[in-house]
A protein has these predicted regions:
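N-terminal signal peptide c-region/cleavage motif recognized by signal peptidases
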Residues: 14-16
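Cysteine/selenocysteine-centered motifs that mediate thiol-based redox chemistry or coordinate metal-sulfur cofactors
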Residues: 177-189
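Positively charged n-region of N-terminal signal peptides that target proteins for export
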Residues: 1-4
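Short strand-turn-strand beta-turns centered on an Asx-Gly dipeptide
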Residues: 147-149
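Mid-length scaffold segments of soluble, non-membrane domains
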Residues: 63-140
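A short, compositionally biased
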Residues: 24-27, 137-141
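Flexible glycine-rich active-site/ligand-binding loops centered on an Asp-His dyad
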Residues: 152-178
Length: 189
């Protein structure tokens, strides 16, 4: 009888880590960034608005789950957005999307953040199906932009991260279902 609890613990430790899945893309339920454990808050699908073409699956990682976009945006805590592309996208289209997202969400901070946006756009390269773009915010560093597994830029500033993450979590996301999924509100496929 005393061996049963030990056996149960051993079995639980042997189970694979849980993961989130959407549209055939699987992301881990937890990541560690600079010694900080982040949990998957939610997954969302970016659809091109005109033809409803799937572009990427995004996963939002935060220190503590929340369905409140303002709480996530205003928290000076580590967060990460991972985009796994489900189709090829050229660097010019990526830069256009970043610029449009800033235009829709930056408000009166747009001019002050132009340098950071230019740095973000310059970090882009053409991406293919299954490529990753990862945006990681650490309060003492800023946003690290990683494209295809390589760090491409570091952009300091809490204002920059707030506007950047508001592209997905703010009032004007590319598509509402993407924001709702990242906030853990949308049903997963």
């Amino acid at each position: 009888m005393k061996k049963l609890p030990i056996l149960l613990v051993a079995l639980l430790l042997a189970l694979p880590a849980a993961a989130g899945e959407l549209e055939g893309v699987t992301l881990p339920d937890q990541v560690t960034v600079s010694g900080r454990d982040l949990v998957l808050n939610g997954l969302g699908l970016r659809e091109a608005t005109v033809l409803m073409v799937n572009v990427y699956v995004a996963g939002l990682y935060v220190e503590a789950k929340s369905s409140d976009p303002a709480a996530i945006l205003n928290a000076e805590k580590a967060k990460q957005l991972v985009m796994r592309f489900v189709r090829s996208v050229g660097k010019e289209k990526l830069a256009e999307a970043w610029t449009e997202g800033f235009d829709k969400n930056a408000g009166d901070k747009r001019a002050a953040l132009a340098g950071g946006l230019a740095k973000l756009n310059a970090a882009m390269t053409d991406v293919k199906k299954e490529d990753l773009i990862t945006l990681t915010y650490l309060p003492d560093t800023g946003v690290t932009v990683s494209v295809k597994g390589k760090d491409a830029a570091v952009i300091p500033g809490d204002d920059f991260q707030r506007v950047l993450f508001s592209i997905w979590l703010g009032a004007n996301p590319p598509n509402v279902s993407l924001r709702e999924g990242l906030l853990g509100r949308a049903p997963k496929n």
